[in-house]
Amino acid sequence: MKDEGKAMQDMMWPRQDANIMDYGKESLYKFNLKCSGNVSENFSKFGDVFFKAAHVITEYILERQRIGELDCYFFPVAYLYRHSLELKLKAIAFKYIEDSGEIFIKETFHNLIKILEYIEPFIRDEINTDEDAYLWMKALFEDMNPIDKDSDAFRYPFKIEIRKDEVWGDKQYTIKKFFEGQKHINLIAFANKMEIVFDILCSYYENKKKRYEEYKKYNTFF
């Protein structure tokens, strides 16, 4: 929306055919990103675009089959897939949360298992249609959780931890590695697992009662 007399411009996001370059270039502030009032729909839309980005990049690197790209792109792909799952889980939660959701966010944060357990009572009918698929997904989350419960392992290959010196009380900064050594990952299996989980969560979000077969081809180990 263009309005040269307005300091801050509102740009609804995400939206159809959005152009982030479409703003008043003379305004004091370029634009203010806003979402619609429906929190659940916003989380769902963001989840969809994160998933699409992960899928497109995965197809690209698998088609090219270049070892250097497979190594370099794994972390971004894993982050995009993982975050799409978190967003879809939160979309489900906010379909049923009637208050501001502050308690939900505080209690679950980025933890996939905690979010899944929080929403389970709301989607019990959908889960009962294929509880084995739900338990498979939950086991996969439990295996991922020690590595990435705070949604930062795939954004950065390490995290900064702050500790206080026991004697002087000074702050000490240390680096914690998420992966201590070389790890071999089947990217095709990993991507397929993420896409199966996303499909299951989409059916929960849409209150569809579906049965699944594809997950049976894969174990629940990260």
Regions from the PLM with identified roles:
Residues M1-F222:
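Domain-scale activation on soluble regions of proteins
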